[in-house]
Curated annotation (Swiss-Prot):
Bias (Basic and acidic residues) ranges: 329-350, 369-400, 422-470, 485-508, 545-557, 568-582
Residue ranges, annotated region (Tail): 198-643
Pfam families: Filament
Key words, A-Z: Cell projection, Coiled coil, Cytoplasm, Cytoskeleton, Glycoprotein, Intermediate filament, Phosphoprotein
Source species of the chain: Oryctolagus cuniculus
Family annotation (Gene3D superfamilies): 1.20.5.170, Single helix bin (1.20.5.500), Vasodilator-stimulated phosphoprotein (1.20.5.1160)
Ranges annotated as biased composition (Acidic residues): 274-292, 308-328, 351-368
Annotated InterPro entries: IF_conserved, IF_rod_dom
This protein's name: Neurofilament medium polypeptide
Gene for this chain: NEFM
Amino acid sequence: VKVELDKKVQSLQDEVAFLRTNHEEEVADLLAQIQASHITVERKDYLKTDISSALKEIRSQLECHSDQNMHQAEEWFKCRYAKLTEAAEQNKEAIRSAKEEIAEYRRQLQSKSIELESVAWHKESLERHVSDIEERHNHDLSSYQDTIQQLENELRGTKWEMARHLREYQDLLNVKMALDIEIAAYRKLLEGEETRFSTFSGSITGPLYTHRQPSVTISSKIQKTKVEAPKLKVQHKFVEEIIEETKVEDEKSEMEDALTAIAEELAVSVKEEEKEEEAEGKEEEQEAEEEVAAAKKSPVKATTPEIKEEEGEKEEEGQEEEEEEEDEGVKSDQAEEGGSEKEGSSKNEGEQEEGETEAEGEVEEAEAKEEKKTEEKSEEVAAKEEPVTEAKVGKPEKAKSPVPKSPVEEVKPKAEATAGKGEQKEEEEKVEEEKKKAAKESPKEEKVEKKEEKPKDVPKKKAESPVKEEAAEEAATITKPTKVGLEKETKEGEKPLQQEKEKEKAGEEGGSEEEGSDQGSKRAKKEDIAVNGEGEGKEEEEPETKEKGSGREEEKGVVTNGLDLSPADEKKGGDRSEEKVVVTKKVEKITTEGGDGATKYITKSVTAQKVEEHEETFEEKLVSTKKVEKVTSHAIVKEVTQSD
C-alpha cells in the first residue's frame, strides 16, 4: 500500500509540476500579447480626428431623432390633455347633478326622519290610549258582570216572590169562590125571607089589586127561577203541566199567545152559535105567542095541550137519554185519567144526592101551590088586563138594558134589583102564603103535573144543549112576560121535579166517575137547598126574579173569578136567567228546585165551569201548543159533564 501510495504521490507531484509549467507558459503568452496591444493603441492615436468627425455625425443624427421624438411626445401630451380636460368638464356636471341629488335626498331623509319620529310618538300615544281603553273596558265588563249577577239574583228573587204571590192568589181565588157560593146561598135565604114577609104583609094590608097583579108577574118569571135552581151543568177542565226549562219568559209569552188564540176561537164559536140560536129563538117566540093566545082563551085548561103532546115528547126523551149515556161514557174515560182526584169527593156525592132528594119534595110543593094559584088567578087576569099591559111595557125595557161587559160591572144590576125588591116584599110574601094554601087544596093537580113534567122537560133539554138557543127563547119570554105567564107557569112549574129525577139517575149512572169534577157545583147546590130548608128558597126566589127583570137575570150569571168568556156571552147572559157562568182563568205557579235555579217548574191550571139551566151543555176546549227546547211536560186533562 505504501508503495502504491508513494507511486500515487509521485504521479501527482509530476502532474502538478506539469501543470505549473503549462501555467507559466500561458502567462508568458498573455503578457506578450499585452505588450503588443499597447503598441496598437499607440498606433491608433493618429486616427483620432476621423473618430471625432464620426462622433459628431452620430451626435447630430441622434439629436435630430431626439428632437423629433420630443415634438411627437409634446403633441401627444397636448392631445391627451385636451381630451382629459373635456372629460373632466363633463364629469364635473355629472358630479354637480349628483351632489344636488344627494342634497335633495338628505333633505328628504331629514323630513322622513322627523315624520317617523312624529308617527312613532303618535303610535306610542295610541298604544297608551288602547291600553287605557282595555283597562277601562275590563273594569266596565267586570262591573257589568257584577250588575248582571245582581240583576239575576233580583230576578230570581222576584220569580220566587211571583210564585208565592201566585200561590196566594190561587188560594184567594179558592176562598173567593167558596165565599161567592156562600154569599149566593145567604142571598137566596134573605130573598126567601123577604118574599115570605112581603107575601104575609100583602095578605093583611093590601087590597085584591095589590096581590093579584104581582101574581101575574110572578107567573111570567116562575119559569126562569124554577128551572134555574135544580138544573146545573158543569164542565170542569184542569190542565196541570210541569215544564222543565231554562227560559221561563219565552214560555210565558207562548202561554199567553195560546190563551189569546183560545179566547178568539171561543168568541168566534159563540158568535156562530148565537146566530143559529137567534133563528131558532124566533120560531120559539112565535110558538110562545100562540100558547099565550090559547092561555087567554082558556087559562083553566092550560094543562090539556101539554097532555096531548106527552106522547111525542116521550120519544124525544128516549133520544135524550141515549145522548146522556154517551156523555156518561165520555165521563168514564175522563174519570179514569183523573181517578186519584175524583176519589176525594165521594163524600160530597152522597151529600148532594140527599140534597137533591130534599129538593124534589120542595119542588113538588111549590108546583102544587103554583098550579092552584094559576087557576084562581086566571079569571082575575082578564079583569086586570090594563095593569098587565103596563107590566109588559116595563119589562122589555129592562130586557133591553145595556149588558155589563165585565164581572165588575155586574154588581150594578144586582144593587138595582135589590132596591126594587125591597118595595114589594109585602106583596110577594102574601102571594107565597096563598100558594102554600093552594098546594094543600089541590093534591090531584100535583099528580097531573108530575106526568106532564117528563115530556115537557125533554124538548127543553134539546133546545138548550147549544147554550145560545135558550138565550133566544128566554129573550122572547122576557119580552112578553105577562102573556106567557099564565100558561108557562103550569109548564115550567113541572120542569124542576122532572129535572131533579133525571139528576138522580145521572148521578147513579155516573157513579164515582163524576165525583171529583162535580164537587164545586154540588156544594153550591147543596148549600142552596140546605139553607132554604123546606124548599122556600126556590119559591121565594121567583117573585124576586119577577121584580128584577133582565137586570136580575144577568145577576144569575155569576162570574166567580172576575172573568167572562166574551162580550157576546155577556150580552146573552143579560137576556136569560137560565145560565150561571163560572170561569177560572189561567193561574201559573212557578217553583224553583235547587239553589242554582236551573230547574224551574211551572204549574198552569185552567179551570172553566159552566153552570147552566135546562140541562144545557157548553163545551169549552183548551188547546195549548208548546214549542220549547228540552221540555218535559206531564199533562192531566179532566173534562166532566154532569147531568143533574
